[in-house]
Design a protein with these regions (language model features):
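Helix-rich interaction surfaces within compact, conserved domain-sized segments
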Residues: 213-220
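Extended, low-hydrophobicity segments enriched in charged/polar residues
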Residues: 1-156
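A generic alpha-helix structural signal
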Residues: 29-32, 179, 215
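Long, positively charged binding patches that form subdomain-scale interaction surfaces
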Residues: 117-213
Length: 220
């Protein structure tokens, strides 16, 4: 499945087998980030599995009724061009609409938004490493792909990695809009992902006075 995802991405990729220490992964990622500034690519760490491949193919090659391993590369390329040429939506508006929906649901369930959903900031831990690529059962990393996505702007990676648009997940243009908004607000860059997780790298923590607002945006 990792090979199929690398073929789907059609860009320079490095495969990392499972390991007990993620230093080699983070060293390669950090180097790729520096190199990407000069060579116009954004590095992303990807946890490969069949569900992710199915999501990518479902979005980029919707006519494909066959096995997800047998996607049409031309259709995928056209999809990328279409997504990259589309105007980027207002990310703040996308998040506000989603938060509004969550508030309505809470009201329907007789839940107090401020007390039961928001609550208070309490405790917390230092979050200084990615979580999505660790296997909690073995305390080892899962197999990973480091992909050098050939785009200039961080939010454009979703043209290559359209992993949403199922259940209540955002579609590709919404993902791009939200990622652009968070980049403009916090310099947040999509950095690691699986079929149902997305982690951003920030140069500094979100300011404490903004933390609740960002948490609500993510909850939406």
């Amino acid at each position: 499945v990792a090979q199929a995802i690398m073929e789907y991405l059609d860009c320079e990729c490095t495969y990392f087998p499972s390991m007990a220490d993620d230093d080699p992964i983070m060293s390669a990622y950090s180097y790729a980030r520096r190199l990407g500034v000069r060579e116009d690519f954004i590095p992303v760490l990807i946890k490969p599995d069949e569900t992710l491949l199915e999501c990518l193919v479902m979005n980029a090659d919707p006519e494909n009724d066959a096995d997800c391993y047998e996607f049409n590369p031309k259709a995928v390329e056209e999809y990328r061009k279409k997504m990259l040429s589309a105007p980027v939506k207002d990310g703040k508006a996308v998040l506000e609409e989603l938060t509004g929906q969550r508030k309505e649901e809470a009201e329907e369930d007789d839940m107090d938004w401020e007390e039961e959903i928001i609550g208070e900031i309490d405790g917390g831990i230092n979050n200084d490493r990615f979580a999505s690529y660790w296997d909690s059962d073995t305390n080892m990393t899962v197999p990973l792909i480091l992909a050098k996505i050939p785009v200039k702007n961080p939010w454009e990676i979703f043209a290559y990695l359209p992993f949403g648009n199922w259940n209540e997940c955002l579609d590709t243009l919404e993902l791009m809009a939200v990622a652009k908004y968070w980049f403009e607000q916090y310099d947040a860059v999509p950095a690691a992902m699986s079929h149902d997780e997305l982690e951003f790298l920030l140069p500094a923590p979100v300011p404490k006075e903004k933390a609740i607002d960002v948490a609500v945006e993510q909850y939406g």
